[in-house]
Amino acid sequence: MRARRTSVVMGLILVLGGSLLFAGAGDGLWMTKVPERDRARQNPFDSETNAVAAGAKLFRQNCATCHGGEATGMEKRPNLHSDRIRAATPGELEWLLKNGSMKNGMPSWSRLPEQQRWQIVSYLKSLQ
């Protein structure tokens, strides 16, 4: 009887702990890994009128499979209209695109030229 209760308690601890870990993975903890020099970077394409349209096209080609065509998220992938994305600096978003966050299921897009990553950032910031 005692062994069964211990098993149930341990099971609950594992489920709760796993839930908290999963919740932490998706709550923007990746932002704490962004170096200050990257966080402070400004989008060099901010003033270019075609950057948003170019970024939208790149988003559809590379990101929509996971985040949805309207960037509203799919299954376990986040809605990019969220407060977290609105609050992120352009530098943080470009850093995430470049480095990814495999723990959260976000691949690195370092194979995309830097200009294209910034154009995607322009698009993401336009969603606000």
Predicted ranges, named:
Residues A23-D27, F45, M74-H81, K98-Q128:
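Axial heme c-ligation environment in periplasmic c-type cytochrome domains
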Residues G28-K57:
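Electrostatic cytochrome c docking/interface patches
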Residues G55, F59-G69, I120-L124:
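The canonical Cys-X-X-Cys-His
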